[in-house]
Amino acid sequence: LAAQGAQGVDLEALAEHRGSLFGGLSGPQPAQKMFESRLAGALAGLDPARPVYLEAESNKIGDILIPGSLWKAMLGAPRIAVTAPLADRARHLIDTYAELTGDPAALSMIIDALRPYHAADQIADWQAQAKAREFSALAQGLMRDHYDPRYARSTARKAAVAAIVPLNDLSEGILRSAAAQILSIKGV
């Protein structure tokens, strides 16, 4: 979107966290006040007459809280849902979290942190996939059985979806086309 001239704020970059149990591997997050200072700077540079694009599934990014006034505005703002095939999303996650494929102990700890939410046999299956380096099956299972259902419950409490942009895959050409499609949506 930014490459096509859209305004956006990358909340995950400001929070130095990717926003899930797997998201905090690059080091410590900034203090809440530092995040808010960065956010204020990013918002000050925006044109209020133009749409602003944000991504957030939750009011919390790691240990950082999105300020209440911004979160409230986000909850009431028009939403665009972008969908993609599970296998393509899995490949993207494997690339994004490549550091985990080389750190079995860290990956195991993160999977163990899901124990309060899933049956022991599900955790054992994910642990076995991680140990066998079956990262595509692991990523697909985590999305299908953990993240997607949580995301669906979370989004059900927010404003209605203004548009759905389905992607056939996550190739550069498809992403550019999707960005153009998003920017052409009226009322957003």
Show the residue positions of the predicted features.
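Hydrophobic positions on the alpha1 helix immediately C-terminal to the Walker A/P-loop
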Residues: 1
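Conserved nucleotide-sensing/catalytic segment adjacent to the nucleotide-binding pocket
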Residues: 4-73
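Conserved NTP phosphate-binding and transfer environment spanning the P-loop NTPase/kinase superfamily
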Residues: 72-79, 83-188
